[in-house]
Design a protein with these regions (language model features):
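N-terminal secretory signal peptides that target proteins for export/translocation
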Residues: 1-19
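Residue-level detector of alpha-helical hydrophobic segments embedded in or interacting with membranes
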Residues: 6, 30, 37-38, 130
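Intrinsic disorder/low-complexity segments in short proteins, especially the signal peptide
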Residues: 11, 33-36
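Bacterial N-terminal signal peptides
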Residues: 22-34
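C-terminal His-loop and adjacent cap/lid subdomain of alpha/beta-hydrolase
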Residues: 39-725
Length: 725
């Protein structure tokens, strides 16, 4: 009988027979297809190793390509925007991986397809990469360039900058037949670019570097060096310099055998890289002056390390550590394009160079594999907070409360400043003995960071138009304006704040100052003026009346007893931006760290010892432990003497090689015997070592052996009830 929706009914027996036939047919099809599936080739695997895929610069990139074993190498195609560049690739010995550098990338997105020649079925699946290319002048992610920007390469052997426009920037002059600049301007440069320069040097037997031409007869005074791999070679260095991200960069490496600039000799390279950062304090608008001793870091070169450096990674050029991190990534990218991936990259650098290591280790995983920060601080942002208190407090004790005999004993100033003070150190500002770290270490930093009309940059009188130079706001906050933003007054938002700070709180609580002194201090001390209200500094920073405290830019009260002096309120958006942009070290670092410094408290040096432990506390707060960070102090009675850095490099090398050999054990599980907290005497001899030598600083345990020998001090904000970190 017919059923609705069907033309006719199907007998049940016939239906079962039909199902059996269909199932059998499907099984036969699967059996026929299975051998084909089993024989399917593994895919190509392609990886960019010189940078992140979206952070390529300069139009080229190094790739590693894993080729399926059954694919003949001569059939590999590397199509860069459709153009085959397979001839740029060579096998890595002992692997199925090809390495090579592609070029000709256009600005913006580029497509790279790695495949086997042909279009037939059964070929390996291609690898497809999308690479985003940026100019070698930057930026990549740091935001709009800072302008005006004064060039410096003409002072450091790289010639005049390349002309990039006809009307604005740093002038470029016509040269005479002898190569000397004339007075005739042929154009201007805003990017301060230079052609890449490769030269060769040799070290003589007196330890000096001299020019060398590969292939020339061997100089009689040429020294030799033995690398950490035990290879003894002539001390000849290949030295490449140029500009990346508008800053001067340097790559140096031993090259003991004859080579040309494009024929790289890696025979004496130990496979490892030192990235040498540098400190100082500056606020940008300048290409920077390089340090030859860091570019040609003898301890590293002689042992076979490659040494990387950039004026963009010198905080004496600028303190925009987003820009600095970008620059370091770009310089390392250039190195990897030249030489391929290193075994590891370890960083060195003191003061601001130490800050960079903590910040970049946090923000750019993979840039650094190990760090040796020297004389470090956690970051610039939180350091600036208590440093901004220094001159407010010094002016109060020198002038506003000058009649109080307590402050005439200079060591008493530690009670409110937290930083060390001495009754015996000569004070150049008073002509007598007695000084503080605020005076000897930090004087002049407040106007440099805060005063928009105080700063300057070398060569700014040459820049066109001069009206652009006159419009610069010379502050640290304007240096990082891309992140903190611009306020309604037209100035960069400023995070510095002292509203509600109870200066001297722990001192009054412990009875070291009286309640009356505490109340008067907090009523009279004010803060810093808003940027539009600031005026030019006085002597000794600028011609004028004596004002080492920058008091003319402080806020006071006409009658502090009835109306306390107003404080400076920081911008909340700027505070948030400092964290979000990565300018604050939060403790997010997982690489091995040896934090080393000379103990310089008696010198009233700005590199105070509490900073190493501030970083440690942040690491503990973020990670739960600080097993990856070691703290080493070397005594410096009478001034810095023994350099512990070579030993730190040796310990770090053993630590890193353990990690590479046993990655499953992690950073802490691979520590060699000497990778512990330690302290040393002035001759570099170990005084104490172990996990407990710094007890009593970040805990309530009895002082450890090193703690007892090297007292740690605080800051004005710690005295006021703030945290140690």
């Amino acid at each position: 009988m017919s059923q609705p929706g069907f033309a006719c009914a199907v007998p049940e027996a016939d239906l079962r027979s039909t199902i059996r036939r269909v199932v059998a047919a499907v099984v036969l099809i699967l059996l026929a297809v299975t051998p084909v599936l089993a024989k399917a080739k593994p895919p190509f695997v392609a990886e960019i190793v010189s940078s992140a895929a979206d952070q390529v610069t300069g139009g080229d990139a190094r790739l590693h390509i894993v080729v399926p074993r059954i694919t003949p190498l001569q059939q590999v195609e590397v199509l860069v925007n459709g153009v085959n560049q397979a001839d740029r690739f060579t096998p890595i010995a002992g692997t199925e991986t090809l390495t090579g550098v592609i070029d000709g990338l256009v600005l913006g997105e580029n497509t790279v397809v790695v495949k086997q020649h042909g279009n037939g079925n059964g070929l390996p699946e291609p690898a497809i990469l999308t690479l985003t290319n940026h100019p070698i002048t930057g930026p990549v992610f740091s935001g709009p360039h800072q302008n005006p920007f004064m060039c410096s390469i003409q002072n450091y052997g790289l010639g005049q900058p390349l002309v990039d426009n006809p009307t604005e920037g740093f002038p470029v002059y016509e040269v005479d037949p002898y190569g000397n600049p004339t007075d005739v301007i042929i154009g201007y440069s805003m990017n301060c670019s230079a052609d890449t320069l490769v030269t060769y040097l040799y070290q003589d037997t007196d330890g000096n570097f001299k020019p060398y031409v590969p292939g020339d007869p061997r100089p009689a005074d040429m020294a030799q060096t033995t690398t950490m791999d035990g290879l003894t070679v002539d001390y000849i260095v290949r030295w490449e310099r140029g500009t990346i991200n508008r800053f001067l960069y340097s790559i140096a490496m031993l090259a003991p055998f004859d080579e040309g600039p494009d024929d790289l000799d890696t025979s004496a390279w130990n496979g490892k890289v030192i990235y040498h950062f540098q400190g100082g304090v500056a606020i940008g608008h300048y290409q920077g002056g390089p340090s030859t001793s860091r570019m040609l870091y003898e301890t590293g070169l002689s042992r076979g390390y490659a040494v990387l450096y950039s004026t963009g990674n010198k905080t004496g050029t600028h303190y925009n550590l987003v820009l600095g991190g970008e620059t370091a990534l770009m310089v390392k990218e250039r190195f990897v394009e030249l030489y391929d991936l290193p075994v590891y990259t370890v960083s060195l650098g003191g003061s601001g160079g130490g800050i960079q290591q903590y910040i970049y280790g946090q923000n750019h995983k993979g840039l650094l594999d190990a760090a040796i920060p020297q004389y470090s601080y956690p970051d610039m942002v939180t350091q600036a907070v208590h440093v901004g208190d220094c001159e407010l407090l010094e002016f109060y004790m020198d002038v506003l409360d000058a009649g109080n005999p307590r402050w005439q004993t200079w060591s008493n100033r530690t009670l409110v400043e937290g930083l060390f003070a001495s009754d015996t150190v000569s004070n150049p500002y008073t002509g007598t003995v007695g000084a503080t770290e605020c005076v000897m270490g930090w004087r002049g930093l407040a106007p440099l960071a805060l005063n928009p009309v105080y700063g300057a940059a070398p060569g700014m009188e040459l820049y066109e138009p001069l009206s652009a130079v006159a419009a610069i706001h010379w502050t640290h906050f304007d240096d990082i304006r891309n992140y903190v933003g611009i306020g309604a007054d037209g100035y960069a938002r400023n995070y510095w704040d002292n509203v509600g700070v109870q200066y001297g709180l722990s001192a009054v609580a412990s009875g070291q100052i009286t309640p009356e002194e505490f109340l008067q201090l907090n009523a009279v001390i004010g803060g810093w003026k808003q940027e539009p209200d600031m005026v030019q500094e006085g002597s000794p920073f600028y011609p004028g009346s004596w004002d080492p405290w920058s008091a003319r830019n402080q806020i006071f009260s006409v009658d502090p007893l009835s109306a306390p002096a107003p404080r400076r309120e920081g911008d909340l958006d700027a505070m948030q931006a400092a964290y979000e942009s990565g300018l604050v070290f939060r403790g997010d670092i997982d690489i091995p760290v040896i934090d080393w410094r000379h103990y310089l408290e008696a010198e009233l040096d700005m590199h105070n010892t509490h900073q190493s432990f501030a970083s440690r506390q942040r690491i503990r707060d973020f990670r739960g432990d600080s097993d990856n960070q070691l703290i080493w102090f070397t005594d410096a009675l009478g001034g810095a003497q023994f350099d512990q850095t070579p030993e730190a490099l040796e310990v770090m090398d053993e630590w890193m090689m353990n990690i590479l050999a046993n990655p499953e054990l992690g950073v802490a599980g691979n520590k060699p015997a000497l990778a512990v907290d330690r302290c040393f005497d002035t001759f570099g001899t170990e005084m104490a070592a172990g996990d407990d030598v710094w007890d009593g600083i970040l805990d309530t345990d009895p002082p450890g052996a090193c703690t007892a020998m090297f007292p740690i001090y605080g800051t004005s904000r710690i005295v006021a009830g703030g945290t140690f970190k």
